[in-house]
Structure formats: C-alpha cells, structure tokens
C-alpha cells in the first residue's frame, strides 16, 4: 500500500506531514512507520488524530462490509463505498471474485476507523483521551499495526482468514459453549428458585454423557437489582450466591453470572465518579486505579463464590455515554477521565485486563457491550450483537440473525462469537422462533437459551434437546449463503446441510 498523505490533527489544527525513510516529524512529535506498525512519540503538543491516506489501487466498484465499534445493531450489510461512512477497525471490499481486506491488529492503543471510496483509503488513528487532545509528555505510543490482504474466491472465507491475521492470540475455550441464561424469560424478575428450575430444564435437555451446559444467572440477583450494583451479596430472593453456585453445579451445570462492574448505588469518593445516572446510581471512572481495584475485588468475590463464567456488561455505554450505533468520530459524551495521560483505548484495555486478571484462567468471561477489537485476546466469549428478545420477534430477527451472519468470521478468530440467546416464551410464536434456535444450533457458535416457565411444552423440550445435540456435535461454522443480497440471510450452509429459513 502506498501512502499518499499523512495528516496530524492537534489542538491547534491540521498539519500535513512529510514521510522521510519511514519517519515524519513536527515540532516535538515523531511518527514512525515500520512494517505496518505506527508509533508516535510526543512532547507537550496536544494530539487528536493521525490520518494516513493511501491511494486506492485495488477496487473501483466493490461491495464493502465493515465491522462495528462494539456490538452490532442489525446494521451489517454489503454496500457501495461511501467516504463519509466511518468503518471501525477493519473492512473488506469484494470485486471481481477478490476480497481486499484492510484493518489493524487487535488490541491497538488507539481507536481506529477507516474510510474509503474508489480513489482513496484512509485510516484514522484516534490519539485522544476521551474528547480531549492528549499530550504524550515524552512517551512513545505504539498506536496500532496496519494489516492488509487480498484473497481470491469467496468473501466469507476471506474475512474468516483475515480475522485470524488481525488476531493471533485469541483466548479460546475447548469444547462446545451452550446452556441457559434466564434474562429473556425473567427480565430481572428472578429468584434462586427460578434459576434452579431453569437449570433442571437445561440439564434434562442435555445429551446423555455430553459436556456440561452452562447456567448463567443474569441481572436481578444482586442486592439492589435494577441493573446496578453493589455486587457483594444476593438479594432476599437469592440468598447466599455461593450456595446457589454449588447447587447449580450439583445439578449438572456450570454456574455463570452477570455483572455490571462500573455502575453502583454505593456511596463513593467523588473522585471515582464519572457521572451520576438516573438520580440514584453512579458510573465509575475506569481510568482511576482505585476504581479498577474495586472492579477486581468484585470479580474476585464472584470467582470465589464458585462461578466459572462471568458475563460483564455495559462497560462501553457506562464509559462513553453512548451505544455503538450512536458513535461517530466524537464518540464520548461523558465527563472527562480523571487520568489524562492515556488514550481512550489504553484506558479501556486497562479495564479489560483488570477483569481478566481478577477472573483468573479457570473462569471464562463473556464481554457484553464491550469493544470487539479491544476484547480479542482478553475474553473467551463476546456478545457480538445487541439484545435479542423473548417478547418481540422483530428484534431477534434484526439483531440476532444479522449479527450471527456478518460477525461469523470473528468466531474462533477473536473469541467465541455469541449472537445472543433464544428467548422462549408464550409471547413468541414457537413455529417462527424455533427457526432461530435451529440456525443457531447448527452454526458452531455459542447457544444459550432462556425458557419461560409457561413455555416449556413437550414440543419445546424436544426441540431444545435436538438443538443441544446438534450444538455439542459440531464445531464447524455455518455460512450465510445469501449475505451479499440479504441483510437477514435466509440460506445457510452448515455441517448438517443447506437450510432455507422464512424469517
């Protein structure tokens, strides 16, 4: 790739840089390029972004698919290039039986976005601290490593291969990931009794002598409930959370649990608070060491209770004040971080590393509402799309199926890609909803199910039993055959053959 232009944006404005033997200089700033690696050394100059523009010598009339900032919101689609479109992390362009892929390696120290049209391809390296310019004060920042590949043939195969180029150190589980999660049948109206009943149903649908399923306790167990901490005990409907973990294990399942680590109603030192929410809860600032210590303490406590899977949620929304679909170049709406010496990406990675270290190697982690490219290598499982539903089929169709198809290339390259649960309630037509169960069970990706108390019929039980049988017997990812023509693919190839679904 030939670099055409390099633009540095500081608090004072735009500076056009000249490249000399892989190095650009401006006052106290040095930008180095080495084999795709981009490093920046800076002094007191407040830095905002670095734009690296390449001449597009590759495609003219391609279809382009890009990733999302965090989860998908039903927006994944192959479409014509548009330079105004901000493309997080990486993209693929398909033309004349070739796929041209451009991206950065996972876990960069800067937020990275791409733009492209028929003439140019631009990487935007965001060096800011939240929305504020960042002075590196003599520090050398290894911002990112650019990678690009060209593949002949199928675009799905190309993107699967490219995801493995971007991430060569994924933290993966061995064996199938499947079981229960009570959110889409209880929606927080839960209890230990309901969890144990749900566990019993999950276990009785599990293949005889098959691998143990998970049973994940979602929101509603904590003392305050209402999607907020503190996280030091169960409420009166749950009691001792360590006892409950042991009961789940004795029933034949692996205990898992949900937590929102940055939100609490506890009285905190005011310095820890990023912002107040809903007039009663506080969002903690992840740039503060003492906040990270508290997060580690909560994760460690849950691990010590005996939970072998921890699903942590909302850290992107609680830090940035926006959902992924709301984010543009100015993606932070919250107050300023207390620590103004790090990039936003470094602050987020520090939080993820804290959670990883506190959980230890014997506890699996699901990241939900976490940043995909920064999660890879830290977490075994990633919720790749926004919530499906136990009450609204249109939501499952939009978020679940679209996400499953278009983020499938990340599965077992970045992490296990979890497109979310099958919510089984009386409010959804089982004749339609069972198709979502089927495509997910055959996909080779995680399969979690929420079973409503009034929806566990003999027919549903038989369908779940068959789905679990499929899920544990296959680790080959399915393929959305018509994904270039259809945002909600109907034709799927899997290890079990070709299926066409009427959604």
Description of each model-found segment:
Residues 1-15, 475-485, 498-503:
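Non-catalytic C-terminal accessory domains or segments of carbohydrate-active enzymes
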Residues 1-213, 309:
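Carbohydrate-recognition beta-sandwich/jelly-roll modules
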Residues 183-185, 220, 427, 452:
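Short strand-loop junctions, especially beta-strand C-caps/beta-turns
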Residues 419, 451-456, 479-484:
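Short coil/turn segments at secondary-structure boundaries
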Residues 439-475:
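Catalytic cores of secreted or luminal carbohydrate-active enzymes
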């Amino acid at each position: 790739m030939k670099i055409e232009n390099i633009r540095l944006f500081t608090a004072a404005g735009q500076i056009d840089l000249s490249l000399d033997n892989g190095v650009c200089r401006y006052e106290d700033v040095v930008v180095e390029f080495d084999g795709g690696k981009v490093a920046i050394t800076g002094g007191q100059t407040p830095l905002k972004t670095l734009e690296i523009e390449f001449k597009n010598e590759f495609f003219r009339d391609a279809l382009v698919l890009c990733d999302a900032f965090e989860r998908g919101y039903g927006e994944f689609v192959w479409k014509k290039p548009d330079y105004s479109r901000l493309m997080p992390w990486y993209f693929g362009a398909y033309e004349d039986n070739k796929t041209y892929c451009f991206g950065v390696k996972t876990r960069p120290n800067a937020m990275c976005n791409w733009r492209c049209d028929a003439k140019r391809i631009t990487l935007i390296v965001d060096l800011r601290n939240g929305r504020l310019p960042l002075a590196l004060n003599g520090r050398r920042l290894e911002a990112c490593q650019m990678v690009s590949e060209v593949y002949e043939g199928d675009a799905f195969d190309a993107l699967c291969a490219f995801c493995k180029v971007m991430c060569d150190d994924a933290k993966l589980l061995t064996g199938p990931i499947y079981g229960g999660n009570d959110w889409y049948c209880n929606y927080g109206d839960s209890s230990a009794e309901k969890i144990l009943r749900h566990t019993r149903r999950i276990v009785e649908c599990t293949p005889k002598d098959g691998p143990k399923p998970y049973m994940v306790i979602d929101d509603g167990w904590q003392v305050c409930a209402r999607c907020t901490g503190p996280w030091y005990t169960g409420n009166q409907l749950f009691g001792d959370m360590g006892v409950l973990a042991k009961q789940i294990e004795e029933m034949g399942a692996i205990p898992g649990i949900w937590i929102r680590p940055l939100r609490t109603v506890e009285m905190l030192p005011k310095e820890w608070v990023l912002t107040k929410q809903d007039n009663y809860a506080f969002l903690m600032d992840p740039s503060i060491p003492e906040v990270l210590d508290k997060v580690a303490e909560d994760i460690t406590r849950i691990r010590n209770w005996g939970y072998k899977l921890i699903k942590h949620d909302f850290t992107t929304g609680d830090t940035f004040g926006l959902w992924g679909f709301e984010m543009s170049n100015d993606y932070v709406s919250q107050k300023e971080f207390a620590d103004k010496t790090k990039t936003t990406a470094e602050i987020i990675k520090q939080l993820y590393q804290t959670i990883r270290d506190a959980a230890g190697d014997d506890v699996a982690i699901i990241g939900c509402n976490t940043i995909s490219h920064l999660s890879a290598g830290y977490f075994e499982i990633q919720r790749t799309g926004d919530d499906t539903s136990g009450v609204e089929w249109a939501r499952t169709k939009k978020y679940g199926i679209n996400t499953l198809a278009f983020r499938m290339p990340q599965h077992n390259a970045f992490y296990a890609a979890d497109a979310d649960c099958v919510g089984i309630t009386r409010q959804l037509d089982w004749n339609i909803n069972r198709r979502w169960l089927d495509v997910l069970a055959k996909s080779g990706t995680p399969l979690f199910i929420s079973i409503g108390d009034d929806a566990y019929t003999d027919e549903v039980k038989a369908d779940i039993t068959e789905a679990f049988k499929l899920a544990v017997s296959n680790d080959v990812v399915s393929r959305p055959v018509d994904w270039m023509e259809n945002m909600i693919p109907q034709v799927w190839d899997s290890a079990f053959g070709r299926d066409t679904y009427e959604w």
